[in-house]
Swiss-Prot record:
The gene is cfr1. Residues 303-314, 352-375, 393-406, 445-468, 506-515 have a biased composition (Polar residues). Gene3D superfamilies: 6.20.120.50, BRCT domain, Immunoglobulins. It is found in: Golgi apparatus. It comes from Schizosaccharomyces pombe (strain 972 / ATCC 24843). GO terms for molecular function: protein dimerization activity; protein-macromolecule adaptor activity. This is Cell fusion protein cfr1. InterPro entries: BRCT_dom (IPR001357), BRCT_dom_sf (IPR036420), Chs5_N (IPR031673), CHS_Export/Cell_Fusion_Reg (IPR052827), Fn3_2 (IPR031669), FN3_dom (IPR003961), FN3_sf (IPR036116), Ig-like_fold (IPR013783). Pfam families: CHS5_N, fn3_2, PTCB-BRCT. Belongs to the CHS5 family. Residues 167-256 form the BRCT domain. Residues 79-169 form the Fibronectin type-III domain. Required for cell fusion, independently of fus1. Appears to have a role in transporting proteins that are involved in mating. May act as a scaffold to retain cell fusion proteins in the cisternae of the Golgi. Degraded at the onset of mating and this leads to release of cell fusion proteins. The keyword rRNA processing does not apply.
Amino acid sequence: MDDTNQFMVSVAKIDAGMAILLTPSFHIIEFPSVLLPNDATAGSIIDISVHHNKEEEIARETAFDDVQKEIFETYGQKLPSPPVLKLKNATQTSIVLEWDPLQLSTARLKSLCLYRNNVRVLNISNPMTTHNAKLSGLSLDTEYDFSLVLDTTAGTFPSKHITIKTLRMIDLTGIQVCVGNMVPNEMEALQKCIERIHARPIQTSVRIDTTHFICSSTGGPEYEKAKAANIPILGLDYLLKCESEGRLVNVSGFYIENRASYNANASINSVEAAQNAAPNLNATTEQPKNTAEVAQGAASAKAPQQTTQQGTQNSANAEPSSSASVPAEAPETEAEQSIDVSSDIGLRSDSSKPNEAPTSSENIKADQPENSTKQENPEEDMQIKDAEEHSNLESTPAAQQTSEVEANNHQEKPSSLPAVEQINVNEENNTPETEGLEDEKEENNTAAESLINQEETTSGEAVTKSTVESSANEEEAEPNEIIEENAVKSLLNQEGPATNEEVEKNNANSENANGLTDEKIIEAPLDTKENSDDDKPSPAAAEDIGTNGAIEEIPQVSEVLEPEKAHTTNLQLNALDKEEDLNITTVKQSSEPTADDNLIPNKEAEIIQSSDEFESVNID
């Protein structure tokens, strides 16, 4: 109690929870009102004493120290252990790492990461249950530095760094084999092979470090695990191949699945072959009959070819061998000549085909002496060229029609009578019909002249312009055109219809010209509805006709009629041609009017080249 202090104070004011006390020296003291006596009011004088309680103080300090020691012993002495990283397996391109279970003590885990060359490459998921990791895609024969870092609430704890080097291709110690369904003999061979190549011990279950799954047949739980883990499923021959070559080989040709599918396909093919064996035996027994029939058909098909070849060869041998000798007689008609040459060409093309039996003509040639040399025949070469031209002309539809007409004419005409005499006989029988049709032609000519007169009245100015242009064109015309115009004018000066004698003479000349110029007429295109207004005879065809003396050359003049009127006149003339059943050739040069000038030439409107007369209309 010696340490007790006692003093007297007076209460100045009492508020809620707080009292103001005054000391004798007039110091103000704030004192809790709860500690005042219950009957104390403002102005009351009270005594206050204070002392130090050391015993209680020591007891409390001792209790506090005990609690601190207990906490330290529980949470402060056992820290988390750093992870221990180890190598499980290393191959040419992969490394498998493993570590011991983590010792965290009382700390909580934050993360577990794997570092390669001080770079984080993998964050381990479920670190409390996962104790290994596999890194693939590494380089051959290369060193790598790995470490595992543990992060907890008690701090960060890294593992020791380990250096691992990948294997070379000739190092087979990294092979880790897991076996599946194995035949006992193959299992023994596998164990011996593993010992010879110093590979890792054989596993019976698929693990993270398994590199190859070896089995004799597919199926089983371990087979499915290996398939899910993308582990190559191979046969025993793969390890034997690696052992024989002393290096790691490619696995593409040793998959057990491909081998199983091959065996299945082979079994299926064997079954199908066995099923098809019986029908094939029956077919072979019936084969001689079929071959005999085929041989008979082939012999019958080749018989006509042999006869034609013999005929052509005999005709060729009959011809003179020297070019200076007199040539043989030509065929009666050009059509017959083209047929003979084309057949000869067909025989040559057939003889050039391989793998065909030699014909009788070839046997005859083989019997001839080797010293005999065949000389060139110019007449035969000309026949071949004509046949080629004739075949090219026959490819067009127009030429095909004309060739059919010519063939019919040659069949109907007797070869002993000349063409001109036969035409005259036919025309003498048809003279009454031609006399009746001349009146209809004159009516058509009068209708055409009336149309021309109507157009002259409406287009006077255009006629003057066209006369100037036609005069300029006449100055530039060639001498051949001037001669042709003079021939037209001489024909225009003739008056009155032609007599029967002239008609018969012209028909005879036209038929003779048609017979002599079959090939020229074939070259001329047929008139159709589309090109009837624009067709023009080629100058070459006109010159050929003039040289033969059958029909005189008619000049080409412009058309004065409008397109519609000209078309109507052409239709009328075509109708007359069909009724007369005569060969009429319409020669017309059409000029379409342009926007700049209404071209109405001051020339002949239309000239009709016929086998019985030449008609024309002259416009001044």
